[in-house]
Amino acid sequence: MEAIWLYQFRLIVIGDSTVGKSCLIRRFTEGRFAQVSDPTVGVDFFSRLVEIEPGKRIKLQIWDTAGQERFRSITRAYYRNSVGGLLLFDITNRRSFQNVHEWLEETKVHVQPYQIVFVLVGHKCDLDTQRQVTRHEAEKLAAAYGMKYIETSARDAINVEKAFTDLTRDIYELVKRGEITIQEGWEGVKSGFVPNVVHSSEEVVKSERRCLC
Amino acid sequence: MSDAAVDTLATGDKAEITEMPSSDSLPEDEVHCDSATISDEPMPADPRGDVLENAALQGAEAAAPGPPGQPPDANAMESSLNEEVIEDTLAECTDSVSLETEPGSEIPLKEQNDLAVDSPASGGAWAGWGSWGKSLLSSASATVGHGLTAVKEKAGATLRIHSANPGPSEGAQTDTEDGAPEITDAATDPSPAESPPISPPSAPRGMLSAITNAVQNTGKSVLTGGLDALEFIGKKTMNVLAESDPGFKRTKTLMERTVSLSQMLREAKEKEKQRLAQQLSVERTAHYGMLFDEYQGLSHLEALEILSNESESKVQSFLASLEEEKLELLKHDLISIKDIFAAKELENEENQGEQGLEEKGEEFASMLTELLFELHVAATPDKLNKAMKKAHDWVEEGHTPVSVDVTKESEEEMKKIEKEEKPEDPQEDKKEEKSMKTVEEVYMLSIESLAEVTARCIEQLHKVAELVLHGQEEEKPAEDQAKVLIKLTTAMCNEVASLSKKFTNSLTTVGSNKKAEVLNPMINSVLLEGCNSTTYVHDAFQLLLPVLQVSHIQTSCLKAQP
């Protein structure tokens, strides 16, 4: 009964071109690392189930966006229906870190009236020798925007699972607390299939009791 | 490389999907009849549904003198009499539900009544008959084959008791201890409780619930070979009913004149078989939808829709900003683009020159590349080509396809394709095994391939839309692009159609030893999904119109500005 999932969360992955968005997603959804990867055109899609608690599965629908500037105006159109996002930068590329602010501002404008729960991801952490962004400053930036920060490597499979599942858990908590609600016309969170066999047998018990008294 | 990976992913997910329909269909069954669901030993979902549906059908037929399924002669010949009869029948029906006047009715019946009042009266007065027959016959048929004699005895006894004493229904009372479930069943019947009780005799109702109890508690089995038992119960019931209601006597006589209960039951069983076949194909249809989604077809369609809607509003707002003269000019341009989109059907026929099926796969790949090249968009058809190749490969067992022979493809792309073919190799090795595929496997593969190829076609159109909108250095006039897009879409649709034809051929070959009722639903379903697939592709293509219009506006404005 794998297909039973509690919710579907739509996540969007953004960040500068060549920071490794597609590779990170592929590592997460396909479990492997592609040495060569074509630049993403517009948007691409991936999905995976995540078990956040025993028996509780969340289906993640991941929108992998093109980082290239020329696609920016299309990818903007896709922000709105996401509940969560991974904002990637390359720890060996200072420029991509500096653009984080810009990315956040841009999404903020385009997702209204909704909000995206972001996690800041410092990618390519296997290339520590070429690091241009310290963990400390990244954490500081993340905290300033109320985000979590995590360093990952798609090549060495470091923290890839954690980046996605932590984000999923955080969103799940918000959904549970009612701070994020399923809304008509918004695709960010969708309710999944829940078996309702229990429901019907409850009814039976009820009527049986009433009959006998 | 991406593709192979996506495939693996999808395959992994498929297992989940197959589970879905059964759990999905459950609630529906439950609505029909809680009793079956509740019985201590639940029966498989399908047979249960069948029996019930069957019974419901039967109930309607048995009860009504002129149901739609029956030869109309009865109606035609004695229409006046029939009208009367129907009225009587209706009275009987309502009566059987509203039990206010019933003095000897036991608690369950009251409960029944209360609940019946709450439940919506769907389907009017006839529904009463349907459900009436259902509650009796569903339980009856559910027990056939298992303790038939017991059923007969018990039913007979209850009927006897009942005809002797119209008030109390002891049978029901005694059975209540373990028979509570079917009370819920009766209670959930969508009986028209609000229709006024016409005739006072409420005897049939008490008797009925007694039978229901008796029958239900005796056992559980499916409707096979127990027709005579049902017939026995049916006849008994008819007699009792007739005794307490002169109007029903006529109904009964009429019925006896037309068909026997067993015959009707057999007919109902046949109908049920057909229905089951249909139901199966419905489940499979759902399966296609799930697969289509797993191959991200829905996501691409949604993303394409987003772009299309956004483009549409851009076009509108731009038109609103123009002065009269310019507006007319631009309108003319946009309409001519629209006309090209509308002309698709004609093109379709022109292009439909049939080619040898084997060549088609390669033909398509090269055509696709060529057309995309003509579009002046940097979209590569790798994923789609791969999906097509995969589809053609499995269906042409034994026939080893030559590697994709793409004439106008750049060397880079060739390399790419070669690269991507590598991960597929292990699958190709399995080819020998594939010759032993069962019909079901061929069927599933057909549906899966259609879902995958269609998803890839839509992805391709989505990518084209993205590239047309943004990312082109040198734009080709939108009108020309529209013309190429038509060709592209037509090629895709033709390819999908030819694939589904291939699949049905393969199904026919593999399933030549199967019965028509097994094979036909599969073939129909493949053809249906093939049709749906082309519709999806075509719809996706239509979404491109505003995109091209925006593109046209952008280029013409750029031209106008300097």
UniProtKB/Swiss-Prot annotation, chain A:
It is a lipid-anchor. Its cofactor is Mg(2+). GO terms for cellular component: cytoplasmic vesicle membrane; Golgi apparatus; neuron projection; plasma membrane; vesicle. The keyword Zinc does not apply. Changing residue 22 to N: Dominant negative mutant. Its main location: membrane. Keywords: Autism spectrum disorder, Autophagy, Cell membrane, Cytoplasmic vesicle, Disease variant, Golgi apparatus, GTP-binding, Hydrolase, Intellectual disability, Lipoprotein, Lysosome, Magnesium, Membrane, Metal-binding, Methylation, Nucleotide-binding, Parkinson disease, Phosphoprotein, Prenylation, Protein transport, Transport. Its EC number is 3.6.5.2. Transmembrane segments: none annotated. GO terms for molecular function: GTP binding; GTPase activity; myosin V binding. Mg(2+) binds at residues 22, 40, 64. Belongs to the small GTPase superfamily. Rab family. Interacts (GDP-bound) with C9orf72; C9orf72 in complex with SMCR8 acts as a GEF for RAB39B. Interacts (in GTP-bound form) with PICK1 (via PDZ domain); a PICK1 homodimer may allow simultaneous association of RAB39B and GRIA2 to PICK1 which is involved in GRIA2 trafficking. Interacts with isoform c of RASSF1; the interaction is strong. Interacts with isoform a of RASSF1; the interaction is weak. Interacts with the DLG4/PSD-95. Interacts (GTP-bound) with HOPS complex components VPS39 and VPS41. This is Ras-related protein Rab-39B.
